[in-house]
UniProtKB/Swiss-Prot annotation:
PANTHER family: HEMOGLOBIN FAMILY MEMBER (PTHR11442), HEMOGLOBIN SUBUNIT ALPHA (PTHR11442:SF48). Pfam families: Globin. CDD domains: Hb-alpha-like. The modification Phosphothreonine is found at T107, T133, T136. It comes from Tragelaphus strepsiceros. This is Hemoglobin subunit alpha. The gene is HBA. InterPro entries: Globin, Globin-like_sf, Globin/Proto, Hemoglobin_a-typ, Hemoglobin_oxygen_transport, Hemoglobin_pi. The keyword Acetylation applies.
């Protein structure tokens, strides 16, 4: 990420602020509705609208992204444990990270329309692609 990208990501995530868990849950719900095959990784979850389990996992997603934003210069170090978990224990198909990234971008665009400029969109897309790359790096 360029310095400008890092600035855009930090500024956008700063505006997310206290809504991070809410937006994380909304992005998950959006992903489940738009890409139903992603539900197969959550057979034990109540996937209905407003589910406590979806909200809880959305909070985990948001916390991981907050950690990533705080460690933009060392994403592999910051996300190593999550990479191990998703590659070795959960065995999530890597394409699902792209689907969640897309759902997150749509969610952020809907909540931050005035701030979601083309430059911010591009920077967030690069950031989420980097996060996805790190999370799938231990699959090899």
């Amino acid at each position: 990420l360029s310095a400008a990208d890092k600035g855009h990501v930090k500024a956008a995530w700063g505006k997310v602020g206290s809504h991070a868990a809410e937006y994380g849950a909304e992005a998950l719900e959006r992903m489940f509705l738009s890409f139903p095959t992603t539900k197969t990784y959550f057979p034990h979850f109540d996937l209905s609208h407003g589910s406590a389990q979806v909200k809880g996992h959305g909070a985990k997603v948001a916390a991981a992204l907050t950690k990533a934003v705080d460690h933009l210069d060392d994403l592999p170090g910051a996300l190593s444990d999550l990479s191990d978990l998703h590659a070795h224990k959960l065995r999530v198909d890597p394409v699902n990270f792209k689907l969640l990234s897309h759902s997150l971008l749509v969610t952020l665009a809907s909540h931050l329309p005035g701030d979601f400029t083309p430059a911010v969109h591009a920077s967030l897309d690069k950031f989420l692609a980097n996060v996805s790359t790190v999370l799938t790096s231990k699959y090899r």
